[in-house]
Amino acid sequence: MSNETFLIPIRQNNDLSDIALNELRMDLDEHALHQRYYTDIAYLAGNSRKYSLNSVQTVASPLIGKKILFLGSSVTFGFGALGESFVDYLWKRDGVAAIKDAENGTTLVDEDTYKPNDSYVARFREELTESQPDVFVLQLSTNDANQNKKLGKITNQNFDTKTITGALEYMISTAQARWKCPILIYTNPYFANPLC
C-alpha cells in the first residue's frame, strides 16, 4: 500500500495534525516497514482523537515566542504517538518557536545509523550554523545503549564523539560556548539497562 493511501484512515480516525502527518510521511519515506507499527499503535488509548494536537488550545505562557531547539530520536519525534510529541504540544499550547530535529533510531555517538550524518552529533553540527536558540533540549538516546555504543570517559578537551560521554561533552560544551543558552537534558530509561 502506498504511504499516502495508508495515511488517510490514520489521519481521519486519529484526527492527526498537519505537523504529525508530515512527520509520518517523512518517516515512512525512509522506513516503509513502519506502516505495520503505526497501524498497531493507532488504536492505543493515548493516540485517540481526544488527545490530538488539533484539540489543544494555546494559553498565555512565558514560553510564547521562545526559540527552543529539540535534538533527539524517537521520543522527541513522537514515534509512539503518531508523530505528535511533547515538542508539538509545547508549540501549540505554549507558543514555543520549536525546532524539532528528531530522527527515529538514531544515536548520540557520531556514527551513521540509517543514512549519512543522521547521528545527533552530525545533526547538531548542522544546527550550529542554522540556529540560535533561547534553550537547547537534548534527549539522551536509549538507542546508544541498545546498540552497545561505548560509554567513554569524561575529559576536559578532545572529546571522543564516537562514545556516549564524548558526544555529550562535545554538544554541551559547544552549545554553551556558541549559544550561551540554558541546556536541558532528558531521557526515558529502560530500567533493565544500566546505561539508560
Features from the language model and the residues they span:
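Sequence-level detector for tyrosine residue identity
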Residues: 37-38, 43, 51, 89, ...
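N-terminal secretory targeting modules
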Residues: 1-71, 75-82, 92-93, 129-134, ...
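Substrate-gating cap/lid alpha-helix
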Residues: 181-196
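Conserved SGNH/GDSL esterase-like catalytic core that processes O-acyl groups on lipids
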Residues: 67-69, 75-158, 162, 194
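Generic structural signal for well-ordered alpha-helices
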Residues: 124, 168-172
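Sec-exported extracytoplasmic/periplasmic mature domains
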Residues: 95, 141, 173-180
